[in-house]
Design a protein with these regions (language model features):
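The feature captures the alpha-helical scaffold/lid subdomain characteristic of nucleotidyltransferase
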Residues: 1-26, 36-46, 54-244
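A short acidic/basic microdomain associated with nuclease active sites
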Residues: 29
Length: 244
């Protein structure tokens, strides 16, 4: 991914966040993007797309919010008859087609997944992920809290560590996995979850990583460092994950 590709991806993400926040859509960082915020205060350095998940009930509100971004950004929605790969994609109008086969969207994009809910849990509506256990108690997710992501703050699950370790054991800090999907070409590099895994500590002097210290009042100080060089420090206040 080139520097200009990354800038375009981040500007698309920033536009999406601003639009969804303004429309009061319930959404939060998801998948590798949440891992990126927790571990790097931004994208995973070797990732090539960004992900959010939003309330299935907010689809109409989201369409109205994101349509305001046209003509600078375009929203792809799969056909209503489609029963899998249900996520939407937001991409810049200045992005160029690069996939090996013609696609109705362009890279870099932001993937928009959906969750449904009952009184106690939420779950990813995509069958593949639901079957893989992407189901969480509301007490893990709500109330949402804002987390750093580059130069913006974005909603995240209340207990983001428990949320991640439900489906990505070791993802918070200890293990770093190579990507298994090439989003630029829209094709798998490796089977899902079959990437090379190394201890993240092997990369501490190469990429920025977040380190945490808890204070006496229950706050958590997050320091973003490369080796011994501190890039930024953020204080995260204590929060009660009530499920509401």
């Amino acid at each position: 991914m080139t520097a200009s590709d990354r800038r375009l991806m981040l500007s698309t993400f920033s536009a999406l966040v601003k639009a969804l926040d303004k429309a009061n859509v319930t959404y939060f960082m998801y998948g590798g993007t949440l891992i990126g915020s927790v571990r790097h205060h931004g994208p995973i350095p070797w990732d090539d797309d960004l992900d959010v998940i939003m309330a299935y009930a907010d689809r109409s509100k989201a369409v109205s919010a994101l349509s305001v971004l046209s003509p600078d950004f375009k929203l792809y929605k799969p056909p209503e008859s489609q029963t899998s790969l249900l996520q939407w994609k937001l991409y810049s109008s200045s992005a160029v087609p690069r996939s090996l086969l013609p696609k109705p969207y362009r890279w870099p994009f932001v993937d928009i997944f959906f969750f449904d809910e009952n009184s106690t849990h939420i779950w990813d509506v995509e069958k593949e992920y639901y079957d893989a256990g992407f189901v969480w108690p509301k007490g893990v997710v709500f109330p949402l809290r804002k987390r750093p992501f580059g130069n913006i703050v974005v909603p995240a699950p209340c207990n983001f560590v428990e949320f991640l370790t439900t489906n990505y054991p070791g993802a918070e800090m200890a293990q770093c996995s190579s990507p298994t999907f090439n989003h630029r070409l829209d094709m798998h590099r490796l089977p899902w979850r079959a990437g090379n895994i190394i201890p993240c500590s092997h990369l501490w002097n190469v990429f920025p990583f977040v380190f945490r210290d808890r204070t006496a009042d229950g706050s958590v100080v997050e320091s973003l460092r490369i080796g011994n060089w501190t890039l930024q420090t953020v204080r995260m206040p204590p929060v009660v994950c009530s499920g509401k």
